[in-house]
């Protein structure tokens, strides 16, 4: 091969190699661009579709490093879009209740700065549970705690902490309120906060940390709400509110709220005669509430809320073992499912129950005269059969030698079912314990279990003689 041929051959080989390298670089570049922009293909609508102008909440944004031919490519995983809760799973089948949480607020107040509270409740977002209470604008070891037996003062605020964390000085004050309800729709918290003059109070609706709507008193007689969690289904939340006499005819309305904005108000209908302090739970696709009749009945009213057409029905729990306090002895108490039993209806106490097929699970004070002790049990046929009294699976939560108080329900969504849980308010101080001038509480919390369980009693536990006066 002469020199010219060698030169041509070497040049041809070099050109071929250069061309191959150039094509490889183009391929690598194309791969990089494709992977980088792949994220924009996630759930993208067709070109002829209109994208709704709604906010997207990014829950997490993860970056993965992928190595390809010594070239580093950053691939971003598609963000998850947070959805509204719909509570469509079935209710968990349980055998009873197991201990879940206890905050020991009063015992801790003997040596620390803990808020004076009452009207506690529990509610959960999709990942975590929180405890709420109405603070009195003071800690217990503080002269301002004198006279905190009073319910409605302008200094009361709604407090919010992770469940199990007592209300210390660093606790968030969510809103101004002497009556409240809170719930999470899957995207953000809704707080319903009532405060102001007894004859002209205001309910503020706070969503995602912002005031969105409000409503004034409609009967000029202590506008009030649940003192436990509201319920949201597919982005619409519902809360029961009453304005009017606490021991006579009152005006109860059911409000429907979308991202903090009132979208509909329905009047109470059905056979319930008086409604206070409802304990509500999701019963997909609707919501059910068990309330307090402070006028005519020691059997508890039931409100069924249709979340689609906003219709309302009401009745009473069928169980002849009634849930309110005061009440008749079990042997003489009655309920016909439709009407108040006209047995010691006033004053009453906030409580809860929930249906389980034809049966009903319920909780109540052990003492039929006052707010002491606490028990739970199931009544066979208690949801469907008038005056049913067959009791099973009874548990003592607080023995009858210790004070209890309000109680209410909250729901927790598991992997396969929705569990029902409840809290008990453990009131200390006045009016029962007159050595001190304050009134406050701690809480104990139980949740449904399909397992076995033991026995015990979980009272507040503070020695009143150790407490500040």
UniProtKB/Swiss-Prot annotation:
Residues bearing glycans: 61, 69-70, 86, 146, 200, 234, 402
Disulfide bonds: 92-417, 124-129, 183-230, 232-237, 278-291, 280-289, 318-337, 421-447
Catalytic activity entry: Hydrolysis of alpha-(2->3)-, alpha-(2->6)-, alpha-(2->8)- glycosidic linkages of terminal sialic acid residues in oligosaccharides, glycoproteins, glycolipids, colominic acid and synthetic substrates
Post-translational modification: N-glycosylated.
EC class of the enzyme, as a word: hydrolase
Domain remarks: Intact N-terminus is essential for virion morphogenesis. Possesses two apical sorting signals, one in the ectodomain, which is likely to be a glycan, and the other in the transmembrane domain. The transmembrane domain also plays a role in lipid raft association.
Protein name per UniProt: Neuraminidase
